[in-house]
């Protein structure tokens, strides 16, 4: 049981570093409330789970192929830059926290989280480095069923983090003044653009190198 809990804590730790997913999830919570923020997080978690499956079934060589990495860097640049620009465009719009008008569908929100996480090559390197090494170490001492159980512990940790992020962002939405909410939305938008430009730089570097 203690080992399983340690994998849940590991999932929380893996989710905590600030990145494009966390920035976008905060923006979703501020603009659209808890459910949109959490569903966005579920979309991102689904992409994480997909990468875990790839590594679990030994497909890491495909993920690290130069063509795949270049494609993901450039696709990530497009997704993050577009999302960042849209976020900044909406900063000046009035924020009515009680109105559901103009909110995207849950399906679109889920897809947005999935794409942002899936198109993040840093996620691949992260999961290859962390989960790959954990998988190799755990496989020496445990059978396949236990590996699946401990891997699910990591996903539970990610799920808990997404839930906490959604609560935090929706709390900001309900308690903070509109000007401060606009400021937080602006910071989220700029963060997404910075990550987007970084991805674009890496994609061009990979393409030319």
Swiss-Prot record:
GO terms for biological process: amino acid transport. One of its GO terms (cellular component) is plasma membrane. It is found in: Cell membrane. The keyword Cytoplasm does not apply. Keywords: Cell membrane, Membrane, Transmembrane, Transmembrane helix. The chain crosses the membrane at residues 1-21, 39-59, 62-82, 110-130, 147-167, 184-204. Belongs to the Rht family. This is Putative amino acid efflux protein YcgF. The gene is ycgF.
């Amino acid at each position: 049981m203690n080992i399983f809990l340690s994998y849940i804590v590991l999932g929380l730790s893996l989710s905590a570093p600030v990145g494009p997913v966390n920035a976008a999830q905060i923006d979703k919570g501020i603009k659209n409330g808890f459910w949109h923020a959490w569903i966005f997080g579920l979309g991102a978690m689904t992409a994480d789970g997909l990468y875990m499956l790839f590594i679990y079934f030994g497909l890491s060589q495909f993920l690290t192929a130069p063509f795949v990495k270049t494609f993901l860097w450039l696709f990530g640049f497009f997704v993050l830059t577009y999302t960042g620009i849209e976020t900044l465009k909406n900063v000046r719009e009035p924020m009515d926290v009680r109105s559901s008008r103009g909110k995207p569908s849950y399906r679109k929100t889920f897809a947005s989280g999935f794409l942002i996480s899936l198109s993040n090559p840093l996620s691949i390197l992260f999961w290859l480095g962390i989960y790959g090494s954990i998988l190799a170490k755990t496989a020496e001492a445990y059978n396949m069923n236990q590996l699946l159980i401990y891997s699910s512990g990591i996903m539970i940790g990610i799920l808990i983090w997404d839930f906490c992020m959604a609560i935090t962002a929706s709390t900001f939405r309900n308690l903070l003044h509109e000007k401060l909410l606009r400021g937080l939305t602006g910071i989220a938008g700029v963060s997404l653009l910075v990550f987007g430009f970084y991805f674009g730089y890496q994609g061009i570097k990979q393409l030319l190198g």
